C-alpha cells in the first residue's frame, strides 16, 4: 500500500505567560496565552521516525519565555512578530505561525484609588494577534474574542421561514445580546518597526462597537454585515 504525506503542522498550544513588573510601588501585569505552529521539512519524522529536524515543543515554550524575559513591553502583535521570525529562521521551517491571546486586567478600585497591586479580570473581550512568518515575509492579523454586547432596542426579527415546528413569534423591537469574535488583517506596514498596533486595535474595536450600537438590525446576520470602514 502506498501513501502520500499531505500538508501538516505541529506545535505547542496554550503556553501561559504572565509577567509582572515591580519597578516601584505600582505593579504592571501582562497575561498572555501563546500558540506556536510550524510547517516545513519535517516529513522524515512522520515517515521514517527521524527526528533530526524536529524542534521540540519544549523548545518552543522555553523560547517564548526567553523572548518575553528580554522584552514584553509592547503590543502582542510586536511580540508575536519576534517569536514567529525566530522560528522562521530555522532552515527546515517554511512557515512559523504564532497566535496570542492577551487577557485584560484592570486595577481594582479602592477608596484610596486604583489598587497598585490588585487586579480584576476585564470584561472587554480578549485581544487576539495572529502572525505568520515565512522567510522575510510576514502577515499580521488582529482581533478580539469573547466580546459580550447587548442592546435593548433597534433589533427586530420578522419574515423568517415558518413551519409546523416554529413557535418563535415575530418581533419588531427586541433585546439583542451576543458574544463577538472579530478579526482583521493589516497591510505590509504592520511588519515594519514603528507600526502602532495599539492605536489600530483601539480604532477597530471602537468602530465595531459603534456599528453594533447604531445599526438598526433586522437580524443578527444583518448586524454582522455593515461596513466598518
Tell what function each PLM region has.
Residues 1-228:
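N-terminal intrinsically disordered, cationic/polar leader segments
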Amino acid at each position: 500500500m502506498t501513501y502520500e504525506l499531505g500538508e501538516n503542522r505541529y506545535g505547542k498550544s496554550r503556553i501561559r505567560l504572565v509577567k509582572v513588573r515591580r519597578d516601584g510601588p505600582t505593579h504592571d501585569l501582562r497575561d498572555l496565552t501563546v500558540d506556536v505552529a510550524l510547517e516545513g521539512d519535517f516529513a522524515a519524522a512522520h515517515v521514517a521516525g527521524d527526528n533530526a529536524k524536529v524542534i521540540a515543543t519544549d523548545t518552543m515554550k522555553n523560547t517564548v519565555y526567553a523572548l518575553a524575559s528580554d522584552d514584553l513591553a509592547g503590543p502582542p502583535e510586536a511580540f508575536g512578530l519576534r517569536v514567529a521570525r525566530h522560528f522562521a529562521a530555522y532552515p527546515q521551517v517554511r512557515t512559523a505561525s504564532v497566535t496570542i491571546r492577551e487577557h485584560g486586567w484592570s486595577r481594582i478600585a479602592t477608596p484610596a484609588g486604583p489598587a497598585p497591586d490588585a487586579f480584576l479580570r476585564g470584561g472587554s473581550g480578549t485581544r487576539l494577534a495572529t502572525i505568520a512568518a515565512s522567510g522575510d515575509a510576514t502577515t499580521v492579523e488582529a482581533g478580539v474574542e469573547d466580546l459580550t454586547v447587548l442592546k435593548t432596542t433597534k433589533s427586530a426579527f420578522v419574515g423568517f421561514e415558518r413551519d409546523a415546528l416554529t413557535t418563535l413569534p415575530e418581533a419588531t423591537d427586541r433585546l439583542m445580546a451576543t458574544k463577538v469574535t472579530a478579526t482583521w488583517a493589516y497591510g505590509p506596514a504592520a511588519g515594519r518597526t514603528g507600526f502602532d498596533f495599539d492605536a489600530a486595535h483601539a480604532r477597530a474595536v471602537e468602530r465595531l462597537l459603534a456599528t453594533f450600537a447604531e445599526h438598526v438590525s433586522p437580524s443578527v446576520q444583518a448586524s454582522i454585515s455593515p461596513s466598518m470602514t
